Amino acid sequence: MLTPIIEKNFFFNKQNIPWNEVEIYLKQYIGQSFIVDAYQDEIFIASDFPDEYSESKYTKKLRGAVAKAKANAAQIIDMMIKNAVNRRWVENKALKHKENASEGWYRYDTYFAIAVKGSNEDQVRLNRYRATLVVRKTPKGLFLYDVVDIKKEASTPLES
């Protein structure tokens, strides 16, 4: 599995992520679907995804590098789905999701990296992250709902 690398930081301010811009960026994915290579699951991007991704309780709690990582991961949603692993089913327990997740939820692990550049714009290292894709399961299919539990892993210096 190749880890998708975010080469360009669209959202680089760690203090005030412009989540409204992230939401607008994510709207380009609406109506598309992507295949999880490990399971051949087809995951669709519905119109509720951009808002949930940028306005969820999880997102609102994010600060610093993890907030920046989630904002920039919007650029590689397709690759994060493609490379997802460790699928597991979770029963829907929230009444508010009774209809839009009527058959429960799938959670998948995924990984991505952000290139960190030096002062002369050379890539210095990769900051690696793991995350969980939250996917609604309905009779109509699987729909990406959010990306949560983003955790930074050990950075990888580039070899000279």
What is the predicted function of each stretch?
Residues 1-160:
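Ribonuclease/tRNase effector modules and their secretory precursors
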